[in-house]
Amino acid sequence: MVLIRVLANLLILQLSYAQKSSELVIGGDECNIDEHRFLVALYHSRSKTFLCGGTLLNEEWVLTAAHCNRVFMYIRLGMHNKNVKFDDEQIRYAKEKYFFRCHNNFTRWDKDIMLIRLNKPVSYSEHIAPLSLPFSPPSVGSVCRAMGWGQTTSPQETLPDVPHCANINLLDYEVCRTAHPQFRLPATSRTLCAGVLEGGIDTCNRDSGGPLICNGQFQGIVFWGPDPCAQPDKPGLYTKVFDHLDWIQSIIAGEKTVNCPP
């Protein structure tokens, strides 16, 4: 299952590498209808084009990747098949958007994260429920679950109507530094490295912003990966949710001064 990441013009200007526009899971299977109640879909309001995934944190907040941002966008919650609407599906708009502006000990690779406050609270239902933030850091070697409506083939673009899910492995960050020398990744980072080194399973375009769930905890946000997707020895990068907890929680709490992680 290939998760596809959505390219954002803002990050194209800021970053010297190419991101996937939205990533889809390659080498996976259709997600069980009950396993992604927290998974949301971001759409462009004018073109009605599917952009990215995201994760519902509570009745009012969604966490996704910053490069998924568009001026005009809406969020579908409780969706499985894009073309078949559940009775409890809900649509919301972004009331507020928050971007990570902290500079201390954070590089440009560590900031692809965005909090969206919805225009009105969501009602939990059979197909809509939140995903909790992690309570402990991720461990290298963990088996992680990736999911999204991104491409299922690469480089040919095949977009599914239903979300696909796949298991990938959480790898040592140094594996990604070695795999992608052209990007000169910093020696230390608050991003996660994950994939299947044998190839064939990966996130891909239009899965950006979706969750990476490791040992049952929400540990990563789909961020960047090689193109074509699912190449051997070419794992992808994921924003590390645990290292952004202070920032996330201070914004949701409505604090006037945002807490930057140490």
From Swiss-Prot:
Residues of the active site: H67 (charge relay system), D112 (charge relay system), S208 (charge relay system)
Claim: Chloroplast is one of the keywords in the record: no
Enzyme class: hydrolase
GO cellular component: extracellular region; secretory granule
Keyword check for Cell cycle: no
EC number(s) from the headed UniProt entry: 3.4.21.-
Propeptide residue range(s): 19-24
Residues listed as glycosylation sites in the UniProt record: N105
Transmembrane stretches, start-end: none
Disulfide cysteine pairs (residue numbers): C31-C165, C52-C68, C144-C214, C176-C193, C204-C229
An annotated Gene Ontology molecular function: toxin activity
Signal peptide start and end residues: 1-18
Domain Peptidase S1: 25-253
Pfam families found in the cross-reference section: Trypsin (PF00089)
Tissue specificity annotation: Expressed by the venom gland.
Principal location class: secreted
Coiled coil ranges: none
Domain of life of the organism encoding this protein: Eukaryota
Keywords: Disulfide bond, Glycoprotein, Hemostasis impairing toxin, Hydrolase, Protease, Secreted, Serine protease, Signal, Toxin, Zymogen
Any one of the GO BP annotations: proteolysis
Subcellular location: Secreted
Similarity section: Belongs to the peptidase S1 family. Snake venom subfamily.
Function: Snake venom serine protease that may act in the hemostasis system of the prey.
Subunit details: Monomer.
The protein's name: Snake venom serine proteinase 9
Species this chain originates from: Crotalus adamanteus (Eastern diamondback rattlesnake)
Native organism taxonomy: Eukaryota, Metazoa, Chordata, Craniata, Vertebrata
